[in-house]
Amino acid sequence: MRNKRKYIRTTGIILLFCVVLLNTACASKQKEKVVLELKQGLLSLIPLNQNAVRVQFSQPGSAPMEELIYTEKLPVPEYEVTEDKQSLVLSMDGISVEFDKGTEVLTFKDANKRIILQEKVGGRFMKVSSVQNEPTYQVEQRFVSPKDEYIYGTGQFQDGYLNIRGLTRRLTQVNTQISIPFILSSKGYGLLWNNYGLTDFNPADQFVELTPANASGEAVTVNTTGTSGNVRETRQTYSFTASVDVPRSGSYSLLLDVGQRMARKYYLVIDGQKIVDVNNLWLPPTTSAIVELTAGKHDIEVQGERNDKPVLYWRPVSEETVFRSSVAQMLDYTVFAGNGDEVIASYRELTGPAPMMPLWSLGYIHCRERYNTQAELLENAREFRERKLPIDMIVQDWQYWGKYGWNAMKFDEDRYPDPGSMMKELHEMDVRLMISVWSKIDAQSEVGKQAKEKGYYIPGSDWIDFFNSDAAAFYWQNFRTGLLKYGIDAWWQDATEPENDDLQNRRINREQTPGEVYRNVYPMYVSKTIYEGLRQDDPDRRAMIFTRSGFSGMQRYAAATWSGDVGHDWETLRRQIVGGLGQMVTGLPWWTYDAGGFFRPGDQYTNTRYHEQLIRWIQAGTFFPLMRVHGYMSNTEPWRYGEKVEHIIARYLDLRYRLLPYIYSQNAAVSFNGSTLMRPLVMDFPEDRFALEQNYQFMFGPSILVAPVVESGVNRMKVYLPECSAGWVDFWNGTPHKGGIFTDVNVDLMKTPLFVKAGSILPLGPQKQYATEETEQPWEIRIYPGADGSYSVYEDEGINYNYEKGQFCTFDLKWNDSDKTLTISDRKGSFAGMKERMDFNIVIVTPESGTGIYQSKVNKSIVYEGKSMVISL
């Protein structure tokens, strides 16, 4: 038995020790961390909670990084340190990290002492660099990634990859791309790379610059949108060519950089084979792909715009995962051990819980670019009510400020003569309003002139410098006095990247800091300003912020994101679903897209091919955390597309509203338990290889498997039903299916494949026109037999923060499959307006009952008055 020394942290006492680590250095154990003094620098192991360890590698005297992510002040967890001649191990209940004294490699293990992650030998890298003539470091860490690992995350990207093992990505904030340096692995860990600037994931150092060849195709004029409003642009495609030599055959990761801040087209051909072909009026400047190449020379063609300067980067796909940041104060990352829920719950414990979203935000959000007048907005809200189409919120997009200048924090009275009466009428219809507010302010506006005089702009731009606390306070003051007074319900913070990665080569924070240092965190500063202002100045209204970009920790500011200004085609639909799932694993739980696409065809109202696309976008979006439609220069209301389309959309609106008791209970699980509503299959089936390979299927809460239709003309499609001992039940027809199989599903335009896990209990509410509508109609409690199951129902007022004071209630539904009994627990807690009596129709799902959207045959009707009940069925 090896001789070991053991050190246990004792509360309130700092134990220090120094031992020889072979030929390296010594270690000191402090109250909050263990510091290893290596020849190359200081390696700190910092226990954060029982399943998370932070690793920092720095140089002596390095200034600590400003803490923007880990804001929760938690006690130092109990941990112990053991040491022998070969290693030093820091251990907690849920994770341990072992330092190898010979290789200086860190190995991470879970609660069962199973290796979940390991650094590569020689994979820790830190070198002196500079940014804007100021000293900084370039840092890099390489990890071992076995071939059977699946990795997800880094945020919302447009490359179409859900499993990003081996894929190269460049993490910057631009329209349609939300960069979050967090990954989740099928091996049972999450990793957050603690850096606020540009980060390269699996960076490719080999590259070729392509040279212009010729123009191809005719010039076309298109309508586009940007920070200066609607613009018509003339575009023509140009070809660029090059060749590359690869030394060996195998898989290669490619990163195409178009050489501008935004792209309009990705078109990459290798040896005549099309690799990428994507068009949109807005695209991130980089995209990625993994291809198989044989050893030798390969001809490359890229098509783009005349001013593009395309560069193709490439690297062999190998058994490693790499993070690299070019601007850093130290190498800094955190490892979380556990399954997907445990990882994200741990992350939120450290970075802040996601507040409860308002109940009404989980209904239907209707948006278009744009309503031009107060009368037009009210007319369309009335039409929703007259047509009995459920809606909770209507959205006023940009340019309501009119003659006062961009984002002047006021309505142009020529078109919006009385915003107060507009809000009153909307609220009388039980319709909420979201309004677009930007971080950019016209420097010639009244507010802009003040901002310029006070030095509150980021120099050389029209973006407010939210890194300057005085500038942020100024912004909120004008926000409060100009807009908050009307009782507006939700706030759309557009273009918060800021648009086009606009901090590069700029100075921020009173010109004291290079923008590159905080290049990816601007959206979090904006959301923080708005959320904290709302909590202070509108404390009785539950906040909802809608923003186009995000970063780690932003969930604590009641911020939801969407996928930006995307197109409408099938490929774009597929990429949005993948992008949303990529964000879900990073801990930011609220997301959606522009259902139907932001950029739509000119004949959208009569084009039946587009109608099919629109329906499939809306069907998928019914099962997103937020359900929303939007479109550029479009009247997006359902009735514009004809009776057939309107009827199908109405059915899915009904389904969304019937699911609200289920969705709102998951809203509580997100806030209280660190859960996730829209769930890539790795979160529930990490051992199922076929599940891990499904790009478009996902779980909606713990019970519902969603398989969106993402291709044209589909009448029948294959759906994978993950391994599940009790199997699955078809939502539409009640047919049971085994788990771990592919099944063929008949798909017509009315249906998107939905399966419910056997043993699930779905609480379905009555049909409603808005989420907070009071009705005496009963709930339907659907029981999917085949296994025991349970569901915890949560209720509160839905519109305020009284839940933070304990004013909410819960009750549990438990199904015993063998004796066919449903037990309803005592109700726990209470809140103002709580129904003392609830009517339930209980249904055991079979092919003859409990199928589809609407209520059907009932097994038993009961009255629940808050006391425990056992119902035999």
At which residue positions do the language-model features occur?
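Bacterial N-terminal signal peptides
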Residues: G12-N23
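A low-complexity, Ser/Thr/Gly/Pro-enriched, surface-exposed linker/loop concept
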Residues: I46-S91, R124-S130
